[in-house]
Amino acid sequence: MKKMLLLNGSFNEVQLIHTAHRLGYYVITSGNDASGEGHKYANEFCPCDYSDKDAIYALAKQKEIDVICACSNDFGALSADFACEKLGIPGHDKYDTSRFFHEKDCFKKMAKELNLSTPAAAWFDRLEDALAYVDSLSYFPQIVKPADLSGGKGIKKVCCKKEAIDAVKDAFERSKIKRILIEEYIEGRQQGITVFVQDKKVVLEYATNDDSYVNPYMVWLACPPADNYEGIRGTIVADIEKMASAKNIADGFLTIQYIVKDGKPYYIETMRRALGNQHYLCMSKDTGVDFYELYIRSQCGESCSDLLSHAHALESYSGFMAIFAPSNGTIKSIEIDPMFQSKLFDIKMLNGPGYRVTDYLTDKIGTLYFTLQKTDLEWFNKNKRNLFRVTMA
């Protein structure tokens, strides 16, 4: 039985583990959190920091690993690609290529090189240089973000120099690699697209509207169809294929978050790792393709042509909606709209009544998974912010 090293074992990796088992792999998970839900489904757990690429490489050598699968974290993707390059394991980008898709400052450099549309930005690896740049700024707002963190961590919108100075210091403090970006603030419709690239061509695509709730830099809700997507599809697909060819990427998934302003997409960030929030469940339901199997097989360097042949146009619209509290405090009750309840195909509750929320901006209470028909879309878009209620004691 071939051995797979999967670089984490959180809730986000549970479906990956089940899929790997179904495909015949002996699964070894890593990570720092032994309590992660996914570890109990693995054949073996080896504690190892997935953000430490050298440690992951050493673990893979020690365990005589056959294939490595990145987890739903940018650090995990980088470490997986690094170890695979060193060991000659297929299915992954070169490490230096991977950095263009998982480190925000490297992405900006690639965007500039390829003339891609993205908010203007400056990037820094020294605090004093970043502060000098802030002092030279003549317009606000700006966005300050660590170059290496995902999930909205450390991102701040700043409206004056004092706010920018504080945000820059905080971003440097949070960044593991001690690099940050200061980026022009773009206001528009946030969307996301996940594509499968085969031989440098987009052969499968899935675009969503991405909404925020209380935290403007964390996706709370993602659901197709993306507004006015057909008007920008040609540009996005051409740009993805330009990136794929220029950086000679391996076959597999590529996800881009972007903002549409005045009918033009502005690319914010990219990733080639597995998505969190079990988003692949939604994509699989709508397209007829098992995205988890597609991800595992591509990470293992296997052909995916047979799976891709099952893809069909969207006939339903599935998405996830995270549940957050409106403030810090103790949860008294959680209510879900009865009509919306009838659209759910899964519910994952992490906490409930009696739980004390200490950071309502990031402390997710649970996630609702739903499927809509075309006739539901108008109702859903009108009511989506009122489909659950968290009451605090």
Predicted regions mapped to residue ranges:
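ATP-binding N-terminal substructure of ATP-dependent carboxylate-amine bond-forming enzymes
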Residues: 1-95, 128, 303, 353-354, ...
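Conserved ATP-binding module of the ATP-grasp superfamily
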Residues: 117-119, 141-144, 155-192, 216-222, ...
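Peripheral (often C-terminal) accessory segments that flank ATP-dependent C-N-forming ligase machineries
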Residues: 113, 296-393
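A conserved helix-loop-beta module that forms one wall/lid of the active-site cleft
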Residues: 85-154, 159
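ATP-dependent carboxylate/phosphate-activation module, predominantly the ATP-grasp catalytic core
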Residues: 162, 184-249, 253, 260, ...
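Flexible, glycine/charged-enriched surface loops at secondary-structure junctions
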Residues: 181, 250-256, 306-311
